[in-house]
Amino acid sequence: MHIGHGHFFQNLDGRPDHEVWRTEMALADRAERLGFASVWAVEHHFAGYSMSTDPLQFLTWVAGRTHRVKLGTMVSVLPCTTPSDWPSTPACLTTSLVDV
């Protein structure tokens, strides 16, 4: 069975941005240790409840701290990125641990 851990960067209670990021980073640090098979991140723009505009930035950080969890994006909003640049970022992370 494959169980993944999703990160939504939700800020429903008005916490400072750095607190939301620290919380998500702490959860990601625990994911591999607790046996999760993957870590997933979303991309949301122009939404007051979520502050994840670049899931690949977060997944790059996770990749540098983990060894076996797979990494994936739950949502990638391609119109908000440069199409020619987008494939190069996940390609730099790894060849076998990224699902986009």
Identify the function of each model-found stretch.
Residues M1-T73:
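N-terminal beta1-alpha1-beta2 module of alpha/beta enzyme domains
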Residues H2-E19, C80-V100:
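Flexible, glycine-rich active-site loops centered on histidine and acidic residues
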